[in-house]
Amino acid sequence: MPEPIEPRIERFSTRRTGRCAVRGPEDMAAVQELWIVLHGYGQLASRFVGGFGAIDDGSRLIVAPEALSRFYDARTPLASHIAAEVGASWMTREDRADEIEDQAHWLAQVLETYRARVAGDVPLTVLGFSQGAAAASRWVARGGVAPAHLICWGASLAPELDLGAGAPLAATRCTVVVGERDVFVSAAQIAVERARLDAARFTHAFEHFAGGHRLDDATLARVAGVARVVGGAPATPAFP
């Protein structure tokens, strides 16, 4: 039998429609901070942005872009996919470089759109949760976006990034937040990541809270510089 012929893979750009979930003031003149927040694997933006009520005090425009790839939850039997949960993913290992490029263009468009709506040059915070932390850090590392604060929650910066003094990331204040009961981030992994960031002399802070793989109101408020959780108790310090 003849050897099977491998197909040629040809790539080209196509138009996609993306969506964002937004919370914060409708009056753009009231916006004092712009937050771009990236959800984790299997989440949707509309659900994810619901976790930011603790800092939604009328001064922040909180924009959650949704990753451009969606899927049915694999735990749901195929026959019942109509009722299955839907999630989104920033990338997979398939066509990795192209997916990273596509997500960067999408995020740049989101930022440009909401920057144009806000009155004045307000500070930008970029937060990535879980898989979104890698997407957020890769985006900032490309340059072209200069947030006042990069927050990686439930994960750290993408491992391949340049953390050197002249790199775009070096000019960004960075905070890594991890729950002490996060089943996806072990103490050993945290130690390795601390050593990597320290070896690169990369300026960063680590925050911990008594919880799992999720956002935490008091910690979010503290990292955001909010003295009191909106509608709740003071943002008291978590674990050292």
Task: List where the protein language model places each region.
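Hydrolases whose catalytic domains are alpha/beta-hydrolase-1, hotdog thioesterase
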Residues: A135-W139, L161
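Gly/Ala-rich beta-loop-alpha elbow adjacent to hydrolase catalytic centers
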Residues: L127-G132, A136
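Short beta-strand/loop motif that positions the catalytic acidic residue
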Residues: T175-V178, D182
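Serine-hydrolase catalytic machinery in alpha/beta-hydrolase-like enzymes
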Residues: E10-V122
